[in-house]
Amino acid sequence: MEPFRPQYHYTPEKNWMNDPNGMVFYEGEYHLFYQYNPAGDKWGHMSWGHAVSPDMVHWTHLPLALAEADNVMIFSGSALVDWKNSSGFGKDGRPPLVAIYTGFRTTDRVQFQCIAYSNDKGRTWTKYSGNPVIDINSRDFRDPKVQWHDATRRWIMTVSLSAEHKVRFYGSDNLKAWTLLSEFGPAGATGGVWECPDLFELPLPGTNDKRWVLVVNMNPGSVAGGSGGQYFIGRFDGTQFVAERDSLIPPRPGRSASESAHWFDYGPDYYAAVSWSDVPVSDGRRLWLGWMSNWEYGGDVPTSPWRSAMSIPREVGLSRTAEGIRLVQKPAREMESLRDRHFAFKSGDVSEANAWLKERHVQGDQLELMVEFAPRSSGTEGVKVLKSDTEATVIGVDRQRGRAFVDRTQSGNVTFHQKFSGVYDAPLAVHDGRVKLHLFVDASSVEVFVNDGERVFTSLVYPSAASRGVELFGSMTSARITSLNVWTLKSIWK
């Protein structure tokens, strides 16, 4: 029995997994590589595990892609399709897949950038004989994300100088020889090391304009404690990233973590988020996922024989808010393919909705739930999931304080690590008074999208087998629900 095995999130069959790596789309397949320990369920012997999917939802496990060798571990990085064979690694007129990763030499702990290539759709890989391609003799230089920049006709590498809270940009014509272009940082939150950067352009809704987003994952010191991720919005000319003024928050003594940066997830368990390369232009989406865990307790979570899962795939976009341009996320539409039984409640107050839920036996640990609360001026409302008489994970909005929150203090096993139990909140401007919550509940996780992804929370939970209930709550009898939809979700493994 594997009581906490997620049924629609990617997990390795066994052993330790952390950051998603090398995410690339090629010939109908989404590739997911990931930090993997082939030898055990704790961090170590870092190599790249591998899985492929036609839809980012249903995954096929593949053999280890890049293995630790000669005292060099394979740390995080990216992958791409070298369409014009600029690297010369192509074969028989077909473009190679090229992986760009950090090598970590265990003897002196120096980190450097390396490349490898594949001529068989990522099934087997050859490490480049000229590695490393960048070596600055640093112990904190990692996680290269590489993309083609059309305007300057060259490859751009975004890579972190982790301990200096900087991101470096390098340029190359052939993926082998690299030139330093510029640096960004320190900026935003600097309470931990900067890791797993990403850089991508997104359209600005309602205009013909675009903005660049620089993503920086950070550990520890993030908004929910431990690992998390921030972003900057600005412009990139192929050489330098310049953040817009309202994207930079000047440091101030006494400022809380939540106020010190723009965070893309306010829960404790969404880290190392990076986006897929080479998604077809005809699709047009920027898609990503993250490691659903936290370095504070990731090695202690009560699961066996595997440790860690990936989040669901998400689409990221920009939105104009009262505070400025902000990043929003929503579940990738492919998640709808998992919907099974559907329960729809039209409208009514909280007690009517709860009676309806009970009457129809709406419960489970594989659920998608969407609820909208009607406008009102004050009070707290939300939903409890994975509920029993003694346990529940509580998701809600406190209108008085202008905060959305997730409370896992009574979610089940919270004692396996002293830093696991907690309440996590985020500022929320309730514009027209309506509040929308969109939840994905799996065997050991809850992902929450508030008000169309304006705020997102990702949280691990370890409930008892009996904790399967769903219940709405409101602090005032006037709390009304304008719509409620619940779906049971199918397993991706059956």
Question: What label would you give each PLM region?
Answer:
Residues 206, 229-494:
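Beta-rich accessory regions
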Residues 1-144, 148-194, 203-266, 281-283, ...:
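Beta-rich carbohydrate-recognition and catalytic domains
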